[in-house]
Amino acid sequence: ARVLEIGCGTGRNLVMAARANPQALFYGFDISSQMLMTASAKAAKAGVDERIITVAGDAEKFDARRAFQLSGFQRVLFSYSLSMVPDWQRAFLNALDQLSPDGRLHIVDFGEMERWPGFARALMLKWLARFHVQPRAGMTATVETLAKQRGLSVSARKLAGGYAVLIMVSKEPVPAVQKPPEKADNSDEINFIHAMIP
């Protein structure tokens, strides 16, 4: 299987997934060259650098298929990166273009925290803004609209009172994202990433 992470950052997800899935090949790109240096070092330290390739690229327009000379990817992942892209809808559509015919796009990102107390939500949004992160209002609805315009299937779930959202997009009917318990840790996101590998 070929797996692409868009906005791979320091390579945490790539290394974790590569160690758990020795049969798969992993690719990633990020706009930050400094983070990619860290990603390369992490992959080498974990002994999975032969199965992880990363390059610099802009999520809104980077053609990963051309860069890596591949026909497409079975899995494409955004992990808390789509909310950092200025034109996130363009980045989403670009990600769909990277999928192979049997491919699936997975998104894990910040939600609108609609069930949080007002003061807690305001503090969290202020803290996220320090890192140039802006949860996208109506992300799930917009993803569903854009995906359906291309005849794609969508399944989505919320975590921890809307703290995060898990979304899967596929050319084939996708299984429902299992409803996780309402808790604050990130184990469900990690399991979601692990489960995406075919």
Q: Where do the language-model regions lie?
A:
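Core SAM-dependent methyltransferase catalytic element
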Residues: L152-K183, D188-I197
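C-terminal alpha-helical "lid/dimerization" subdomain adjacent to the S-adenosyl-L-methionine
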Residues: V108-Y163
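A short glycine-rich, Lys/Arg-flanked "PGG" loop and its adjoining helix->strand segment in the class I
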Residues: Q89-P101
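Short glycine-centered segments of the SAM/dcSAM-binding site in methyltransferase folds
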Residues: R2, D102-R104
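A short acidic, Gly/Pro-enriched loop at the edge of an enzyme's catalytic core
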Residues: A64-V76
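Short N-terminal helix/helix-N-cap motif within the alpha/beta-hydrolase-1
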Residues: Q34, P86-R90
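A short SAM/SAH-binding and catalytic strip from SAM-dependent methyltransferases
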Residues: Q74-D87
